[in-house]
Regions:
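Flexible loop residues that form catalytic
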Residues: 37, 66, 120, 187, ...
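Conserved alpha-helical substructure of the radical SAM core
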Residues: 1-114
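Radical SAM enzyme [4Fe-4S]-AdoMet core and its adjacent flexible, acidic
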Residues: 42-45, 105-249, 257-258, 262
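Cys/His-rich metal-chelating microdomains
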Residues: 24, 28, 35, 249, ...
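Short, intrinsically disordered, charge-biased short linear motifs at domain edges
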Residues: 14-19, 229-235, 253, 269-281
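Flexible mid-to-C-terminal extensions adjoining Fe-S/redox cofactors in radical SAM and related proteins
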Residues: 13, 240-246, 258-315
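Short clusters of small/polar residues that mark proteolytic maturation junctions
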Residues: 73, 186, 265-268
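Alpha-helix N-cap/loop-to-helix initiation residues
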Residues: 70-71, 100, 161-165, 270-271
Length: 315
């Protein structure tokens, strides 16, 4: 599997493509511009997504939103991407409010390799940040229901920001306790234009110390997905307010609900083909304003791609 990722890197093919199958969401996250229903949303079929996936050939196909579990045909979409789409790895990105043990098992059977479950605090504060009362306990209950699974296909996804960066070690320890993995993604102000959640420069030494501790946990337990390269870029983003040389459109991009393409989830577009997206967007792309996990991991130099993927896929 790692070989396909390296091959995509060398052939300038996307490492990750996020199929945003709906913009509708049942959460009201403080850091996000989405939320609520989307009346009369135009949505592609499972077959249309699979056809695109087969043509694009990403290393990772994410099924995301919005909240993807709001789609009643989500299992059909996953199965289509895994079979007709020939996706090497399928990840469902979810807040988990609608994720039951039964649905988890059905999606696993359909071909889902991993669930990226949002978790930003190691306690009930997560509910307020995501706008869903009882969400932390819901996630805790799901993990307990899956205790008999030989390997829980769950990776927590934490958005690192001003109000929670001191809690990152506690989140990593919780992931160890619950026998799951955890990833850390940098807060981006591009979604809401709110700079208030940026970790202030005067606290970056604290963040450096915390990420050093997380790397120790990673070496010992192999349950932290984010690597030293990603943490260094995270600190650089908070220090400078941006990261140059964005590779959106090449290393990663978005499939919209209607199967048109966007450079990323923060820059909307309706390109019909990858060729059209690259030709129009990439020459004029000067954006520096995010360092989300998909960007940080897709833009690693080749040596870090190899080293980090071998480490992550062995876990």
């Amino acid at each position: 599997m790692a070989g396909k990722g390296i091959r995509n890197y060398l052939e300038h093919r996307p490492l990750s493509v996020s199929f945003e199958v709906t913009y509708a969401c049942n959460a009201r996250c403080k850091h996000c511009h989405l939320g609520g229903p989307v009346p009369d949303e135009k949505r592609a079929t499972a077959d249309q997504y699979a056809e695109l996936c087969r043509e694009i050939k990403p290393f990772v196909a994410q099924i995301s939103g919005g909240e993807p579990l709001l789609r009643r045909d989500i299992e059909e979409i996953a199965r289509a991407l895994a079979t007709r789409g020939k996706a090497a790895m399928i990840v469902v990105t979810t807040n988990a409010a609608l994720l039951t043990k039964d649905r988890y098992l059905r999606l696993r059977e359909a071909g889902v390799d991993e669930f990226s479950v949002s978790l930003d605090y190691p306690d009930d504060r997560h509910d307020a940040f995501r706008g869903i009362p009882g969400l932390f306990r819901k996630i805790e209950g799901l993990i307990q229901e899956l205790h008999e699974e030989k390997r829980k296909a769950i990776t927590f996804s934490c958005v690192v920001q001003r109000d929670n960066f001191l809690d990152l070690p506690a989140l990593a320890r919780l992931a160890i306790e619950w026998d799951v993995r955890i990833n850390f993604s940098t807060y981006t102000w591009l979604r809401t234009k709110d700079m208030g959640y940026m970790v202030p420069k005067e606290r970056l030494d604290d963040l450096r110390s915390i990420t050093g501790h997380l790397l120790e946990i990673r070496r010992k337990h192999n349950n932290v997905f984010a690597s030293e390269y990603v943490f260094n870029r995270m600190i650089e983003f908070f220090e400078n307010g941006g990261i140059p040389d964005c590779r959106a459109g090449e290393r990663f991009f978005i499939v919209n609900p209607d199967a048109t393409l966007s450079p990323c989830g923060l820059i909307p577009g309706q390109y019909k083909t990858r060729k059209e997206l690259r030709a129009d967007f990439m020459p004029r792309n000067t954006c520096t304003e995010c360092n989300t996990s998909i960007r940080a991991n897709c833009e690693k130099p080749l040596w870090f791609q190899f080293k980090d993927n071998i480490k992550n896929l062995s876990g």
